[in-house]
């Protein structure tokens, strides 16, 4: 069996590990944001997906980026959730930007960023000053330098 990387189609469809990961996001994120946002300044919470991919699978099913956007939409009336999505692959970033724009039109604060997540951590932490922050750095992010996470 040969390892399958992102360029070989790993992100083309939801695999069992992704299905499990997305189930956790579906059940945990709305609760996290609603519970922590209830007591936060302006009822505000910041969510980051550091390896968002294109946000949605080609078959239309939500990937991790869209899972965050769906969580924000679910609690939109009571909590202001700011969603930041980072993707380094340009082609996937373009699709991710379109997905984020869809939710922005629905009143969700959503922004897609192109590049390495390490380049955006300072900005994310700055935006989340004084409010709850959920950093999602999934297994694809195994190469994130520990120092980049701990310095912020």
Protein language model annotation of sequence segments:
Residues 1-3, 43-44:
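Active-site-adjacent bridging/hinge elements
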Residues 6-14:
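Glycine- and acidic
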Residues 11, 23-125:
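SAM cofactor-binding core of SAM-dependent methyltransferases
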Residues 110-152:
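Active-site segment flanking the S-adenosylmethionine/decSAM binding pocket
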